[in-house]
């Protein structure tokens, strides 16, 4: 016997794709031998239903009439006959497996012994090597009989009742063929001689399916029970989480404070319809939100709530901006202003001028009555100090955020200063100078030597008696400003 013939005799045809496969490519855990490709394509949880559908289609399209089998072809499943003695009895199209005592079904310990052939394990439950080659190609699996799991019985019965309407003979064949492998031959004869009425056969199919479901492999039972459990309880869990978040508010509270419903686990829009549907009006299987298990304490209105602890980055201090933000929130303003103020309080790393500029703008927008001078007075009187307002050199903070009633003026010429465009003495906060006066002072003192405060005094640095002086880069910037202005005015 050539190697090609040996390989062909070892191949097994898949029940779904009818292609010859090697034993390692076959899976025997379902009611029919199927290849791994079909199982991966259909999914292990749906393969039983696909096998049952293919079985009904083969039966409906007349695969039971006798046809000769080619050397490499699989015979249809309904043409497999008894292998005991071919001439002892006529071939019966629907008698799929031999039920004589010569070949008992391989279940339990016998199935384990069937996988050992001369001490060599045969992979994945493949039939014994002493079986005839034609049986190896015809998928004779006596321990697998057709049966539908209980959760698929109504669907299969309903569809077959319509598909087989007007074919009572074929329906009786269907009912008789649903017997498990352990049914005796006498019971099989009784099934054959039953009247061809539709209802008794379907009820008999119900019983045999239930029995066969108990005899089914544990893997198949677990796989078939996964899908309904997964679909139902995942949805219920999501809906319960929505009820926890939106259930406590009554209808009046919902109208007043819609921000309680801002964060949801459900993509449905806000509104009364959503809450009514969640509370059990639309779905009967969900527990209602009025049950004791899902009751939550009512949320107090925002006017009684203190500002959240996360508004200020410093937990032991109460900056004036945080109090102003709380007052603005209680007065009905948007909470965005409170968040902006909190971000400003935390932003002490920026330059002093920019920080004060941001604070003054935000304070005017949020209607806060505090000015930097009042803040300094409050700090001197014992109000907790705001760490976010500290700078590297406190004296270099320009008092740029004084309200418009007290304009910024130059110390020398008393001209009004712009908010950010002037020279500030780092030692004396009241020393503010415009750029023209600063230029004149630098020119008078001589730009090459030490240039001190434009006021004419030698203001000392903080904590020392050494007077401060302009750096060369600052002098160049102040002197270059005059040139830039002239260039801008040129046509």
Curated annotation (Swiss-Prot):
Residues 186-196, 203-213 have a biased composition (Basic and acidic residues). A zinc finger (RING-type) spans 410-457. Keywords: Metal-binding, Nucleus, Repressor, Transcription, Transcription regulation, Zinc, Zinc-finger. Its main location: nucleus. One of its GO terms (cellular component) is nucleus. InterPro entries: I2BP1/2_C3HC4-RING_sf, Interferon_reg_fac2-bd1_2_Znf. One of its GO terms (molecular function) is zinc ion binding. Residues 254-264 have a biased composition (Basic residues). One of its GO terms (biological process) is regulation of transcription by RNA polymerase II. Residues 410-457 are annotated as: Cys-rich. Transmembrane segments: none annotated. It is found in: Nucleus. Residues 347-376 have a biased composition (Polar residues). Residues 60-213, 245-330, 345-399 are annotated as: Disordered. Residues 306-328 have a biased composition (Low complexity). Acts as a transcriptional repressor. Belongs to the IRF2BP family. This is Interferon regulatory factor 2-binding protein 2-A.
